[in-house]
Amino acid sequence: MFLEKRQLKKELFVFLIITFAATYLLDFMVYMIYGLKTTSNATVWGLTPVAHMLFPAAAAIICMFYFKSSALTRETKIVFALFFSYMVLFFFETYVYPIMGTIGVLPLASSVIAILGFLTVFMLHLKKQWRRGLKPSRLFIGKNLRYYIILPVAIFTVILASLILNYITGLGVPSQEFNLYLFFVTFINMMFMGIFLLWPSVFGEEYGWRVYLQDRLFPLLGGYRGVLVLGIIWGIWHTPTILLGNNFPGQPILGNVAMIFFTIAVGIILSYAVLKTGSVWIAVLIHLIIDMMQVPSETYIAISIHPVFSFGSGIYGSVIIAVFSIILLRSKVWKNLKIRESN
């Protein structure tokens, strides 16, 4: 058992070193080349957080090959190959030249790869043998499929209520008008786009944090301590982005504190979802819902006047999400995850 724990720690630390080094180095390079975010470089800085999101899964995949993971089946390698193809092309199109132009701000060629990847994952679920090949790497859609409805609807409702509280309490105002109908219409359109075009970036975070890191932290620390540490790591990973003015503009210190509160609260929900289903895809779906709510909520519900002390992704919003998270912590799914010392 000592050797197993030592191996888990080794895989964990190598993953964290790659993920943090790549993310922080990218931010440093973009800052040195483009400076702080302005109207002239808004596209690059807007896409850089998307690029960040690809690093955790990339680090996880590198570690899986380096440490010769048994989860690297043929089907898994196909998905990983498409993910890396997207990542390489996305970086080239973002920081060098968009080969086929753009869809809005998104590079077109890498978007085509994203659609191809989505269709490939779908097709790999059509045969039992292929699904079996995806299961060890948690790329199979999983079990307890009712949670694909229950949890996304629940988190959407909780966050929507939190966002509306920003408007009701005067902590925020919409950039256009308060209109829930237009919010829903815009959100649905963005979700449709996100599922096909943005899933690789969300997968990038969730496969790294909720699969690779989670599968190593929980056996070492147990479910409760593991999910807390995972949330803290996830929050700290956002530090350079916040220092450079994203997420919580003008709040480099309090912004990082608010982010860590938020990632702990949301991280519990995402980890619970993966533990209940055995699949990364439910975490991808929930994360995508949270991200896709941002633009329509700012337009038709409220933009926070003070991003830290507010509902939504602010501290007040994190408290509301935390109430839901604490309810999930009562589940038995968190128990018996730690390696037994006596074995």
Task: Label the model's feature ranges.
Residues M1-K9:
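Short, Lys/Arg-rich, polar N-terminal cytosolic tail immediately upstream
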Residues R6, F65-A71, M123-G133, I326-N343:
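Membrane-interface capping segments at transmembrane-helix boundaries
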Residues L12, L16-Y24, F28, P49-A57, ...:
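Alpha-helical transmembrane spans of integral membrane proteins, capturing the lipid-embedded, hydrophobic core
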Residues T19-G35, F91-E93, L160-N166, S331:
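Alpha-helical transmembrane segments of multi-pass membrane proteins
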Residues Y31-K128, R146-I150, Q176-M193, S310-V323:
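Alpha-helical transmembrane segments in multi-pass membrane proteins
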Residues K77-Y86, G226-I233, I282-M292:
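Central hydrophobic cores of alpha-helical transmembrane segments
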Residues T157, F203-G231, Y272-S279:
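Membrane-interface helix/loop boundary segments of multi-pass membrane proteins
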Residues P249-N256, V280-W281, I286-N343:
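C-terminal membrane module of polytopic membrane proteins
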